[in-house]
Amino acid sequence: MSRRLDLDALDLSTKTIPAQAAIGTYMSSTIIKAPASSVWQAVNDTDSWPIWNTFCPGATIREQPDTTKSRSGRLQLGTKMTLHLNWNPRGTKPKQMDVGLVVTEFDPPIKGRETPGRIAWATDSSAKGFPSWLLYAERVTELHESEEWDGEECQSVTQVLSWESQRGPLAYVVRWFMGKNFKMCLRVQADDMTSFVEGQKL
């Protein structure tokens, strides 16, 4: 049975930023006709991002907590990375920006479990860039799997909910001057993910 989320009733709090304390919150949602495990693979494997992720076409892993996976592009709890963002994902001239982040939550989806799969990353104070008191951001991605009838059989579908909350003085600048574009970029990323994951099934 489908259990799609009511986007107007969500609590968009992150681990460290309550919803009511966020200066800016930017969200996207998409339905992917695939199990949550397939979506998790796309989100978690940064080596695949250049193939499908036009908003964030690359990530440099700066540090892995598990030294046996130090050269792996797969995220884990505590991974420190630099995201290479493109703020013009549908244009011909990229607008690039690098952001240092650390994975703060890592909970892969489990078939049949009520709670969603969830991964989050946040501003890494040890990386180059704005100090965290000036701009602190936390990005959460949740994978909610359910079953839907397609007229012939039940199939697994995943509702991907992704949002970023920000605080600090520069968060006002982002909201005023970049908020609309940020929402567009998240929408593009959601569409890209949907096309990529569903295409993997072919």
Curated annotation (Swiss-Prot):
Pfam name, any one: Polyketide_cyc
Domain of life: Eukaryota
InterPro entries: COQ10_START (IPR005031), START-like_dom_sf (IPR023393)
Disruption phenotype: Does not affect the production of oxopyrrolidines A and B.
SUPFAM superfamilies linked to this entry: Bet v1-like (SSF55961)
Role according to the record: Part of the gene cluster that mediates the biosynthesis of oxopyrrolidines, polyketide-amino acid hybrid compounds with feature structures of tetramic acid. Does not seem to play a role in oxopyrrolidines A and B biosynthesis.
Protein name: Oxopyrrolidines biosynthesis cluster protein O
Organism: Penicillium oxalicum (strain 114-2 / CGMCC 5302) (Penicillium decumbens)
The organism's taxonomic lineage, starting at the top: Eukaryota, Fungi, Dikarya, Ascomycota, Pezizomycotina
Gene behind the chain: opdO
